[in-house]
């Protein structure tokens, strides 16, 4: 699959088979991620791979509780509050692996650089027949001292992109895209 095909085929996947993702496949995704450009070539990222399902279940519970305790009435939609309150909802969708991309240090564009690495990772996963989903629900709690400690992250690391990876149960259907506003100047 060429890069343009991966761009147009990549979709968020939230339903996975139980088949584990092999170490070499996960390493290949990380190898592609670190090919991303970065400001001043600082490459300010680190990667944490988690396949321990009881740990992912615990992080899911902690992240949901954290989000609910910090949710603002009128700001956090009721639909999201209800989802987070559901004991059966696991924020990682029982995926076989989580790859967390964290920014190392306080470089001015470290977060943006990690986002570029994340897109490389997700496109490479698509090209390899794997599915991914960026789990925004996990970000805030993973950035707390307790969240960092759960994964052995140093205090200087900032969790940016928690991405689940697995073998999709079914092919992701195409999704309509909005027409972008484009301004041509000159």
Q: Where are the model-predicted features located?
A:
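N-terminal amphipathic, basic helical "cap/leader" segment at the start of enzyme domains
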Residues: 1-92, 186
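C-terminal helix-cap and adjacent tail motif
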Residues: 6-9, 85-86, 159-186
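A generic structural signal for short coil/turn motifs at secondary-structure boundaries
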Residues: 16, 107-111, 172
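Small-aliphatic-rich amphipathic alpha-helix that forms the alpha element of a beta-alpha
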Residues: 33, 99, 104-149
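Short, surface-exposed beta-edge/turn micro-motifs
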Residues: 44-45, 95-98, 159-160
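Short, hinge-like loop/turn segments at secondary-structure boundaries
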Residues: 65-66, 150-153
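Arginine/glycine-rich "motif VI" loop of SF2 helicases in the C-terminal RecA-like domain
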Residues: 126-127, 154-156
């Amino acid at each position: 699959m060429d890069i343009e095909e991966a761009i147009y085929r990549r979709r968020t996947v939230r339903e996975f088979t139980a088949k584990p993702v092999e170490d070499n496949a996960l390493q290949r995704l990380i190898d592609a991620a670190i090919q991303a450009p970065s400001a001043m070539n600082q490459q300010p990222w680190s990667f944490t791979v988690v396949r321990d399902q009881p740990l992912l279940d615990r992080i899911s519970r902690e992240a949901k509780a954290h989000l609910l305790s910090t949710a603002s009435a009128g700001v956090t939609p009721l639909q999201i509050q209800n989802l987070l309150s559901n004991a059966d909802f696991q924020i990682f969708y029982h995926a076989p692996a989580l790859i967390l991309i964290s920014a190392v240090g306080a470089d001015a564009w470290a977060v943006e650089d990690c986002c570029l690495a994340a897109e490389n990772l997700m496109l490479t996963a698509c090209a390899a027949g794997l599915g991914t989903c960026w789990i925004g629900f996990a970000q805030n709690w993973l950035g707390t001292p307790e969240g960092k400690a759960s994964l052995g992250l140093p205090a200087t690391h900032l969790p940016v992109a928690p991405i689940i990876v697995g073998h999709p149960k079914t092919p992701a259907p195409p999704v309509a895209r909005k027409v972008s506003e484009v301004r041509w100047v000159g």
